[in-house]
């Protein structure tokens, strides 16, 4: 291998790396583990013997963010974010992708990039180049780009034979979009969230976000809601005469359709009734054609998935990406509906002959001759979404199978004949008024044979002769009301986004998903997008202050500018600077006029001062704070006008009127119901503003069960994480031993009587203690073998396991034979004694301290805890 060229190849996902390596090595490769797997084999590269390493990233290597100094909501004015620098940091630091790429690139003379062939993929190309130390200008270490639309052997081999250079302009277009979306979105979101947090009781204000794409998307939903809400129905009347012909009773359609004047409609009804017979004025037959579909692009796939299959856009894209990485369909992100001239339809059809559902149909297409698809739009990116190899439901799974089935049927429809049918129209005259009836008869099913949902509805008509007269059976005067449109469906919303240039084929699903996750809309039956009170109020607020903020025009303009960057027709930095300047001015005006939006919020939501019940005392003013139970649950001090967020999905009660030694706030006890639910005390102030540095770094407080969202108030720190030495509820005084499952500490649940238990302060592990004991407490003594806290149990005299009816016992839950036999571990591994020491990897031994009784600085960094 010493004399071989070394070639590094990087794909976007591990599964694609495996497919590429399998094809190019003909299955003769070795695989070793790394941050992502590395497949190695020998082969030829550009006429020379080479040793290949094929590995992958897992999406974007880097994400954009603000430097640390701009992360503090309390000290940074959102206005400053427009001028703030941005940094790129590893998207997934724990995966160590940068280090992995750097290591694998050592000694390699060439690198071939197999990232997805869209703008995002092009951007990742340059992230990989940066991580590996390759340089586009270095002639000794060459970088190539493989362009492919599927992970089939044919496409991979073709891409390998036609390597190109990465497109920096497309990568810069993504950089521009990321910077614009970050600065605009975060500035508006921080200001809105900070302004409205703590003002209203029934407002879910954890994050009130704004997004240049997200907000216009919401705007479409609210616009339809407003149309429905302001719609005023009108009565109308229509004539409906009935005739009988050859045993068929037919209702005739009035040429005037309907009238909004009852008196006029009544006059026409009288004329028709007096006419008595209908005279056939004309009988016409016309050959009609329903054209086969063009190729399937992403937007149309998402629309069909929502309207016909019941999948949301996000789910549909996940399924499509999975089918793509497994090699069943071509790349699912494309704007094109036109196939390239080089597309091999015959091979693609042959791959489907074996399918038990439509294999026979495919065989007939090949035997009789298939039709070339009708011309569509060539966006210059990827071919339409196409099946690449045969699959069965067992191979791909239920939901993925339904999506795959549609992709196959759509493709087969594009190469099938058109649907042909004869449309018959009969015009009749009654009392001087013209009516008609129509019928349809299919002569050639064409593509509708494989796409039955697109079939023409057949309607049989009896035969009519021009000039014949037919008796009128009756004439109804139908009364109806005009109806408002329904709520937007996901499919209709996708169409509007595409029409107005909101998002791309790669991001439309994300924007729709976001407005649902933010509780701005709810997806109801029929995949209808119904805006919530919060979503409606937000859009109405933008409309009052600056309608541009929720209209699609600005985002459409931004997308156009970004496209110019991608084509090399505009400078990346100039576009970013121009757009940021526009939004900076709009932000300043928005801040000045925020009272207009607040007035709408006040009309819709209840002020905190008028809500909730008194629960615990504020440590600052010593007045009672009100408990707001609406999501997100919180305490509100009307005197200090401060809000303190509480854990969710549980109950909160006052805890024996005890106070925190750090800030004098009254403690509350949080409990999760159920036999395996947890309880822990917390100080409202400490929970929102942890007083010890590094609490979130050490314990991942943002991941603590039921911790509040990351806002300017900080992450959640209950007493079970607090190391304060003098607080009787802290982990130092209530912690017993290390958790057997994680790096946490098992803490005595203070209100678990009579079903006593220890709860891990980080994970879901629970240790059940002897049930029915009168009292269980921790002591200041430690186990000499494992340094865990000694607990004291006062057993019930009727059920005591102690000899001679004794009830009081002290011991270590890990080392005491009696206690070890009485405890049970839930959601974790059992304690195992090894050399006299209990099992567990928790930080700190026993109650979180090191051996000995050193005093602990309450301002410590937690690094030594």
Curated annotation (Swiss-Prot):
Cofactor: Mg(2+)
Residues carrying the site annotation Interaction with DNA: 73, 190, 197, 333
Record: active site: 331 (o-(5'-phospho-dna)-tyrosine intermediate)
GO molecular function: DNA binding; DNA topoisomerase type I (single strand cut, ATP-independent) activity; metal ion binding; mRNA binding
Binding site for Mg(2+) 2: 116, 118
Positions of the UniProt region annotated as Disordered: 833-865
Residue ranges annotated for the Topo IA-type catalytic domain, each copy included: 167-587
Pfam families: Topoisom_bac, Toprim, Zn_ribbon_TOP3B
Domain Toprim: 6-151
Stretches of the chain forming a coiled coil according to its record: none
Binding locations of Mg(2+) 1: 12, 116
Extent of Basic residues compositional bias: 833-853
Region described as Interaction with DNA: 209-214
Presence of keyword DNA-binding: yes
Biased composition range(s): Basic and acidic residues: 854-865
Details of cofactor binding: Binds two Mg(2+) per subunit.
Family annotation (InterPro entries): Topo_IA, Topo_IA_2, Topo_IA_AS, Topo_IA_cen, Topo_IA_cen_sub1, Topo_IA_cen_sub2, Topo_IA_cen_sub3, Topo_IA_core_domain
A Gene Ontology BP annotation from the UniProt entry: DNA topological change
Gene3D superfamilies, sorted: 3.40.50.140, Topoisomerase I, domain 2, Topoisomerase I, domain 3, Topoisomerase I, domain 4
Its EC number(s): 5.6.2.1
Known role: Releases the supercoiling and torsional tension of DNA introduced during the DNA replication and transcription by transiently cleaving and rejoining one strand of the DNA duplex. Introduces a single-strand break via transesterification at a target site in duplex DNA. The scissile phosphodiester is attacked by the catalytic tyrosine of the enzyme, resulting in the formation of a DNA-(5'-phosphotyrosyl)-enzyme intermediate and the expulsion of a 3'-OH DNA strand. The free DNA strand than undergoes passage around the unbroken strand thus removing DNA supercoils.
Family: Belongs to the type IA topoisomerase family.
Name of the protein in question: DNA topoisomerase 3-beta
Organism this protein belongs to: Arabidopsis thaliana (Mouse-ear cress)
